[in-house]
Amino acid sequence: MVAAGLGVVPVSARDAVLARAARLGTGSREVLDVAALIGARVELDLLESVTGCPPAAVDEVLGSGLLAGDGGWLRFRHEIARLAVARAVPAHRRPGMHARILAGLGLLGCSDDARMAFHAEAAGDQPAVLHHAPRAARRAAGLGAHREAAAQFERALRCAAADPNVAAGLYDGLAHELRVVGRYRDAVEAGEQALGLWRQAGDRVREGDTLRNLSYALLSMGRGPDVVAAAEAAVTVLEPLGPTAELARAYARLAAARMLFSEHLAAIELAMRAQAIAEPLGALDALSDALSTQGCSLARTGGEGTGHIRRALDVALSAGLDSEVGRAFSNLYYVYASQRRFAEAERYFTDGVGYCDEHDLDTYTAHLRGERALALERTGRWDEAVALSTEQLAGTDLSSLYRLCPLHVLGVIRARRGEPGAWEFLDEAAAVADACGEPTWIIPVRLARAEAFWLHGAPRLAAQEAERADDVAAGSDGWERGAVAAWLRRTGSPRPPRGELAGPYRRQAASEWAAAARAWDSLGCPYEAALALHDTSDEAALRQALELFTGLGAPAAAQITRHKMRQLGIRSIPAGPRTATRAHPLGLTRREREVLELICAGHSNAEIAATLVLSTRTVDHHVSAVLAKLGAPSRSAAAAHAARLGLVGAAEDRQHRS
């Protein structure tokens, strides 16, 4: 149903419609006006009940061509016609007509609360709005239509006659729905309204639960200290009241807050407390949340936490808990991707975004897309990372917290490519991360800034940024500690590594550069592999690093590598791809041209790797770059395009001359 007043009606169309309507008799015009206010499809028995007009009046309207019959229904032939008629109904008559429609729907046993709430509001019937709108909101939320749910709560709150207790409950519901759909500032305002009203009413249970919900909304605003304060206050209010579902939710929320500040042992203990209360009470939302948090903290302390998060997802899916489903998908993708288990992460991104888009879970969609951009950056798919990050930042309603990943990605890739504007992104990212106060956000942003300074030839400033990351890394996982250790060493900081390091970082800390590079390559992280090779003094490794940087389109790191090679007295250093690349009609590097020639010859990636003495991971990256530069969706399309441009023949001529 489209509410009257929405949409644009061209003047010419309006005049044509109203000219037809003016030719109707009085009773028939009443039928037309009521039909326009009912909606796009009109039950014939409802229309007759509301207007009391004889069938002849309906026949006259049908004869005008504005309405058409459809069994027991009537419908406007064009929505523009309905809008034109509805807007022409005099304002003083509309409330009475909507009141009659509302009464007619009631007599017919209408169970559509959203429809009833619409007509009740238009009729000025506040008790009816307060009856139907909250019911419509809860039904919409249960169906995953969270924007509609928020709109219905807002409709109910427009009734000034609502008593404080009723209003408090409505604000609570609204705050939750607004947070889910990404309207964070409005969610905080609604939560604060609810909190004041519950305190005024002296309802401690609802006060505590509202504080817990408010903590969620504050999290999405990037207000880290306030997140913890609200969660702690919720527990303080609810603990004296005994083991309730509300207390289980509060423990789960405080556990999540502790996790975000890298207090993982406390987070795990609180999550287990929440589960002990939630499971016997059947508080499945609290159970899912607690399992999700416990899994994340276990993963970040060296344990295998994904099993807990998968159980959290199963619990939420089976109970139809949209918000908890979105959180579990987001956490699964984050954990797998942060551990560089990209193949395992992929399904949770695809399934998660699909679910979140379908259920209006904008908060978790934003989180998934941000983490996806980081994964694309880590795997050398920079064009895709830039495209996704740019698309995210174009969203006007994205909160500061969910701007962090795209800001980080765009800043660091611009720095690597030697493009202008890197600091614009990295400065904003640092401001947001520092305000949030969470190590999970501070560390990657400070390391991105360390890299940017290093690439710009400012090692002292780079070391300072790496040390700022190290300052908050005590509770981080081995991957974050490893990244911090690598940049401390690379930038010349005297600080030693903290604790156990994960994956290839252990090899780097032990100066096993070749092994580290192979490990990065096996994980699909070509830029990290190149950095590991750069950190050695071995000529062959440095040449390989230079080739990788060049192939990735990272001229700043390539130039630093050339400078290091010159300092080591290495001769015959490749000057870079610029002249050859510019001469090539598609801008392919030398290695990419070799890969293209072998693609055209029908070689598989494994065969190309054997021919060029490269790893299959490196070849995968080169093939992706070639397809992108040719604008080809497949290898066969790339070969056909190269043949049309005459590139294959040129390759064969060189082979025959050699």
Task: State where each predicted segment sits.
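Short secondary-structure boundary elements
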Residues: M1-D163, G173, D471-W479, A485-W487, ...
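Inward-facing hydrophobic residues that define packing positions of alpha-helical scaffold repeats
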Residues: V58, H98, L102, A120, ...
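Tandem amphipathic alpha-helical repeat scaffolds
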Residues: A84, R135-A141, G169-G182, R206-G224, ...
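Repeat-based scaffolding regions
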Residues: R93-Y216, A229-L238, Q508, A515-D521, ...
